[in-house]
C-alpha cells in the first residue's frame, strides 16, 4: 500500500479471464 494505492491481490477466477460464450 505504498503511495496510497490499494494492494494488488490475485483474483479468483483471474481478472484477465472472463468466461464468455465462444463466437460462432
From Swiss-Prot:
Gene Ontology CC annotations of this record: extracellular region
Cystine pairings recorded for this chain: 11-15
GO molecular function: acetylcholine receptor inhibitor activity; ion channel regulator activity; toxin activity
PTM per Swiss-Prot/TrEMBL: Amidation of the waglerin-1 C-terminus increases the affinity by 2-fold.
Effect after changing residue 12 to A: Very important (34-fold) decrease in lethality; in Waglerin-1
Keyword Mitochondrion: no
Subcellular localization(s) per the UniProt record: Secreted
Entry keyword annotation includes Transit peptide: no
Residue ranges, annotated region (Disordered): 1-24
Tissues and organs where the protein is expressed, per its UniProt entry: Expressed by the venom gland.
Impact noted for substituting residue 5 to A: No decrease in lethality; in Waglerin-1
Domain of life: Eukaryota
Result of altering residue 16 to D: 1160-fold decrease in affinity; in Waglerin-1
Swiss-Prot/TrEMBL keywords: Acetylcholine receptor inhibiting toxin, Disulfide bond, Ion channel impairing toxin, Neurotoxin, Postsynaptic neurotoxin, Secreted, Toxin
Family: Belongs to the waglerin family.
Function: Waglerin-1 selectively blocks the epsilon subunit of muscle nicotinic acetylcholine receptor (nAChR). Also has effects on rodent ionotropic GABA(A) receptors (GABR), since it potentiates I(GABA) in some neurons and depresses I(GABA) in others. In mice, it elicits tachypnea, ocular proptosis, rapid collapse and spasms, whereas no toxic effects on respiration and blood pressure are observed in rats.
UniProt miscellaneous comment: Exists in two forms, due to cis-trans isomerization at 13-Pro-Pro-14.
Subunit details: Waglerin-1 is monomeric.
Protein name: Waglerin-3
Classification of source organism: Eukaryota, Metazoa, Chordata, Craniata, Vertebrata
